[in-house]
Amino acid sequence: MVREALSKLQASSLVETRHGIGTFVLAAHDAGNFKITAKNFTTVDDVIAVLELRISLETEAAGLAAERRSPDNLKALRAALQAFEDAIKVDSDGVPPDFQFHMEVARSTGNRHFTDLMTYLGTMIIPRTRVNTAMSAPEGRLRYLKLINGEHRSIYKAIKNQDVDAARAAMRTHLSNSRERLRKGKNAHTQQPES
């Protein structure tokens, strides 16, 4: 009965057993504090901060996707790319297929944690769902969507060709460009003279 109780405490990370020494109570730690919710996206700076997080994670995900992708992953990536192109043609904002493309990159890693993180974050990671178009796309919405599409095509091509370095570079460029567009939009918005 005592062994069973100790096993449960170990599984819960409440105690640690050191063979030949004994069992020790571990210090309590706060494991559930990390959250990114819509409440965390109240300013352009918040959106930029999440983009910086995405740059670090999704750059590596793209490299892993290039290394590990399957033919089925390629089909799913191509379908998401086509759905985004179709959305542009009908003057849609393209958020669902944009997110789907990034989700398919995550799936192509073969690492469920990338997919779980993308699922957790959801479409709120797409900057144009958090800020107005003038801020995220100072060059105009249609031109902006075409730029994104071109960047997605570069990511897809690198993953298809299993070029790990090119996939990382393409994803880093894509997300860094989004960050820079937001910074420029923010600066242009804050420097406008009052009427």
Model-derived regions, located:
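C-terminal flanking helix
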Residues: 10, 179, 183-186
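Short linear motifs at protein or domain termini
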Residues: 1-57, 63, 67, 188-195
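Conserved amphipathic alpha-helical segments that form helical-bundle/coiled-coil interaction surfaces
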Residues: 50, 54-133, 151-157, 166-180
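Short, conserved clusters of charged catalytic residues that mark active-site
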Residues: 10, 45, 100-101, 150
